Amino acid sequence: IVFHQVTGLLNSDDECWHQVKEWVEAARVANTLFYNRLGCMGHYYSGMLDIYSDLTQQYAHFGGHIEIIEVDELSVLRKEVTDEAIKQKVAVFKESFAVQNDCAQYELERSARTSVALDALVEKYKLGSMAYYYKGAAGSENEDTISSIILGVSLLTARGIPVAGEYEIKNAQAMKIMDSFGAGGSFTEYYAMDYTEDIVLMGHDGPGHITIAEGKTKVRPLTVYHGKVGSGLSVEMSVKNGPVTLLSVVQKIDGKLFLLVAEGESVAGPILEIGNTNSRYKFPIGARKFMNDWNANGPAHHCAVGIGHIHSKIEKLGSLLNMEVVRVC
């Protein structure tokens, strides 16, 4: 019989009740995952082998429901968006983001149309998270849709419906876990190291979690997208300075999943100002050992980053889900 025990005093025992609180939080997150509806829109990125997921194993470990969605459906919903809805969504953009002066009104309205359509898609399927990617073909209707999606999916992520790019289903699950714990959960990957500062630089194009940003998230125009057709608006942010937790859902050679965790710190410093999410991270074991130990566990190159140190909560969630939890630092 699986059981979990907290030992302490009924009264005047802060540590005891801290543990009880974490178990309750973990149970709530497990329940959220069990009833979550994950939307998967588009297709995988060619040759990105570490990203591919066994959907049956996702069901087996987390429960929930996975809805396979065509980009065409979002394109159809865009046609139904009214001018007034576009106007209202542009106002939301200007309130939620620091829209840079070189962002054309046409691009804001194009992104607003897609954002309103995304809201309708989420409502139709009652989605609690999402993964998407669509390479597209130049000149197609779907190009217009997918090249104007970033602001909309960033707003969804900010309101508790985390969206992962590059059809990263495992990371959509990790982001949902982090967000359900109230830690955020932004889509990221490591891309560079600063050996002098002992820093790992991490970030990604596409959606960012604007509620855990250091300052207001900027909106910038991009003339070229990474791995997809078209051009449009993107978001630029850094994760709040302070303690952070990284989480990856990893698939083992036998097909089963486990949770990979690292705790570190988001630190101030220069980042690439290229319309992406970019942050600088320090780890207690150092940048080199972090990279070696993290990669030794075989994760995909994406992970979810959230604010605060919550390994102990994730450990309890793993116990409730009967999943191994591996801590790197």
Language-model region placement:
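Cap/lid and interdomain-hinge subdomains that line or gate substrate/regulatory clefts
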Residues: 1-90, 96-97
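Long, internal scaffold/assembly segments composed of regular secondary structure
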Residues: 88-181
